[in-house]
Amino acid sequence: MSDSWDDYADGWDDNKDVQKYAQLAFNSLIQKVNCKGLNVLDFGCGTGLLTEKLSTVCNQIVAIDPSVKMAEILSQKHLTNVKVVADYLTPESIQQHVELQKSFDLIVASSVCSFLPNYPKSLSLLTSLLVPNGHWVQWDWAAKNEGDFGLTKQSIEQALIISGLNKRALDVDFSMKAKEEVMDVYIAHGIKPA
């Protein structure tokens, strides 16, 4: 497996599993959050499969991803209510990109957090970008034990606590089959206190 997400960009939108994951995530999101008219940050947007779906119901979306190639593919979709930022999310990038200097009603992260070097620290930074009563929703591969690929329920719970979010949901949301293995996907939904 490559270390660079740029290497996956060209065929990403054609991958049936990636398409299915985005659709299942969107379906569960709209059951939990009324997205109509919301200002959204899609953190780790990739080529924007989830962003595209959100753009049909949300007001404005800022989509951020450190993969320049993936961000370029999303930009080429010319979604009128989407601003694309090709960068890592850091305090410095927030100061650098005017699109990130506002508060969001909803922040989503689809199959992102298990790849972060410091998930709790990143979630705390993301929480600072939410409006009071704003929603955080993430989907990540479920790890059965610490050290396995993905995130454990306990590590997600701990990150929600550290970031100050009130937990609304933390459960297996759906499963995906890869070869002979079924992999569960957690959904975590938190709300920033008023």
Give, region by region, the residue ranges found by the protein language model.
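A short acidic, Gly/Pro-enriched loop at the edge of an enzyme's catalytic core
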Residues: 95-107
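Short alpha-helix
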Residues: 149-164
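Class I SAM-dependent methyltransferase SAM/SAH-binding core
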Residues: 47-95
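Conserved class I S-adenosyl-L-methionine
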Residues: 1-34, 37-44, 73, 143-144
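A short glycine-rich, Lys/Arg-flanked "PGG" loop and its adjoining helix->strand segment in the class I
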Residues: 120-132
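Conserved beta-strand signature within the Rossmann-like core of class I S-adenosyl-L-methionine
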Residues: 133-141
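A short SAM/SAH-binding and catalytic strip from SAM-dependent methyltransferases
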Residues: 105-119
